[in-house]
Amino acid sequence: MSSSPPPPKPHRRSCNSPGDSIPGWISESINSGSLRRVDLNSGTNGWASPPGSVFSLRSESYFQNRQKSPAGDYLLSPAGMDWLKSAAKLDHVLSRADNRVMQALRRSQTLGRSLKSFVFAVNLQIPGAKEHHSAVFYFATEEPDPVRTGSLLNRFVHGDDAFRNQRFKLVNRIEKGPWIVRKAVGSHSACLLGKALNCTYYKGSNYLEIDVDIGSSAIANAILHLALGCVTAVTIDMGFVVEAQAEEELPERLIGAIRVCQMEMASATVVEALHVPHVPRGVGWAKVNHHKSTDELTLDD
């Protein structure tokens, strides 16, 4: 395996900027996943962190003129990606004893470090006839500011699931890929995932995980399997946003973003499907499905 590229450029959170040290557990998370970090422009079969400027989000004056502007820095730092395969759907991956990101954080905390760290994970669950896949994207912070009391991200993390479903937005773009994939994905470049798909939220004391069931929408499932059919030729940027719906919430900010670079299906790590025990609401984590049968993606601007 080739060595990891140098630390990302300063378009992301400052802890990933040259000259700044990345916390050890985040560095471990970045470099130990089933998909390695690769060069932003030439890398294949891995992930990278695209500059926020490739995404257009609601600007400070959006509700006056509907103008968007290039996104700035991420609120949270990239902490790696997992590409997983299992005999059944993988739920609540951060609760697993073998989750490498939480293992790294726990090791750091046993040394008295990273005690205020917070992890945000998005688990895209991809159904299959015999095998299920999960693409899990991790973001993290050691600073309280991104999730400070009163911030939109704080309201999202600590809010109820009705609020989350109305606000959780994916913005995406095809960086490289066949015309048919560009056409299909381009028609759904911004989507309120909580309204279009079944989303399950798991909140722990120091994390929030969002499991997105791609199979709950026929259109989303068809688009994804179209892309997977030529996945080694596709590079896609995905950004995650809490949608601003009031002037005081503008401008919109990226929670985090990832570029998946010409991934190979065979790169998936095989993991055992575990039964997730039921925990009453308010004890440890919360789980709510946004039940909705739909063949239409909820598009957004």
PLM ranges: what are they?
Residues 2-142:
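Extended, low-complexity intrinsically disordered regions enriched in serine/proline/glycine/threonine
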Residues 104-117, 123-301:
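Extended amphipathic alpha-helical regions
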